[in-house]
Amino acid sequence: MKHSVSVTCCALLVSSISLSYAAEVPSGTVLAEKQELVRHIKDEPASLDPAKAVGLPEIQVIRDLFEGLVNQNEKGEIVPGVATQWKSNDNRIWTFTLRDNAKWADGTPVTAQDFVYSWQRLVDPKTLSPFAWFAALAGINNAQAIIDGKATPDQLGVTAVDAHTLKIQLDKPLPWFVNLTANFAFFPVQKANVESGKEWTKPGNLIGNGAYVLKDRVVNEKLVVVPNTHYWDNAKTVLQKVTFLPINQESAATKRYLAGDIDITESFPKNMYQKLLKDIPGQVYTPPQLGTYYYAFNTQKGPTADQRVRLALSMTIDRRLMTEKVLGTGEKPAWHFTPDVTAGFTPEPSPFEQMSQEELNAQAKTLLSAAGYGPQKPLKLTLLYNTSENHQKIAIAVASMWKKNLGVDVKLRNQEWKTYIDSRNTGNFDVIRASWVGDYNEPSTFLTLLTSTHSGNISRFNNPAYDKVLAQASTENTVKARNADYNAAEKILMEQAPIAPIYQYTNGRLIKPWLKGYPINNPEDVAYSRTMYIVKH
């Protein structure tokens, strides 16, 4: 990738002068006189404090109000933010050089100490940050100990060498560390602002360092942001007003879009997909997302403890039929756990992908028979999913495939979210619906989920060879070497079948033809209003 940190982890990146990620208006473009955008978000933001954010609604707004060390471009590649360059000789100690013209919205400079304060605050148990774990995931020295109350925040492995130099020490080498710093949890906050009182995130009070400032907020109605004149790249900001409308019903948001009240939606009802394609061609988008929908098998007890049973069940899921007919809204069949769009991942073709469904079904029957199941002794199991029309539709289709091709008696069981989570955490299931959307754009965010010690390992999969190859990947210095390890891990998953990947997520949204600069192909759907503009229409 052109500016991938993963590729150049041991080198110094070039200055940000040539890498500014802002609105790029082609020569000759006639801009609309009124540069005002209305964006749909799925709910009222729970908090505009980066350390308290957890859901996409607040994150979308926070990305406009604050800026971290690095940003993502339209392809999801890392580009400079507050930092102009970074280096590491061992992937363990990282040094970031901050731009000297980065300022807070009140005109004061953004310094390395601001990041030290913000990251210490993130892991401080008193902050109660729902994303404190991300600092531990990144491997910052003492992060987990501080979260657990066994060390103090000032012992975090982050120091300000001087006003514009930030040094971070990790507990082990991590080649893709810089990728993680694009996460909103690592955005800086101004200490004086935070300590000014509980209402520091309200309009008129909030002092961020992003391209926009919060001008107005009416709870459950709207949030309005306008350009931050002190932002280092403000000269390239085109949109002069962005209004976020929180609407939690897809149908209601779509209705307002069609009425001309909204320029871009976060989603649309899947059952309207074909109609929308027909009614508003060129405005319906379903780009790939960094996420996989899958079924997890209980590898520790019950019939699915047998690898042959798991593999037979996985092979019999007709992924092509599922995406084309059952879903039919642009999803792709998942032949790997790691989505195809993941940075640093070039998947080797799965043998399953190269076989017809008839061939897969025949092999699955042989496997199930070898495991002792057949017409005289049919396999019986329970398929658990959390309550949702979409999950139910998929479960019915899969159960039908298993019954028709393998004679499996499947009992479908749906549970409300809290009960479902309890069942998942206690291993009270045979097969359970699950999904994973990457926390960062690198294969490890998916594959480490199935390592033996990971809390998200729903299947309780325990495979030393799998753990070993992923541990090895974390020490590799090149994308090519890591990709080989990741494909080796995917091969183990295919053969052992602790999970059955079903489809890769897409991110459905509606976009008016006059809105340009939206990074529609960013796998994590990371978007900044400063890259967008409206053409004359």
Region spans (language model):
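Extracytoplasmic/peripheral linker and loop segments enriched in polar/acidic and small residues
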Residues: 25, 30, 95, 159, ...
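Alpha-helical secondary-structure segments
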Residues: 111-118, 163-169, 173, 210-211, ...
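Ligand/substrate-recognition segments at binding pockets and active sites
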Residues: 219, 361, 365-438, 479, ...
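Structural transition elements
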Residues: 332-370, 388-393
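N-terminal lobe/hinge region of extracytoplasmic solute-binding protein
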Residues: 40-90, 120, 205-208
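Extracellular/periplasmic solute-recognition and catalytic clefts
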Residues: 215-226, 243-301, 324, 333
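Gly/Pro-rich hinge or "lid" segments in bacterial periplasmic/extracellular proteins
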Residues: 77, 144, 149-155, 159, ...
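Long beta-strand-rich cores associated with HINT superfamily self-processing modules
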Residues: 509-537
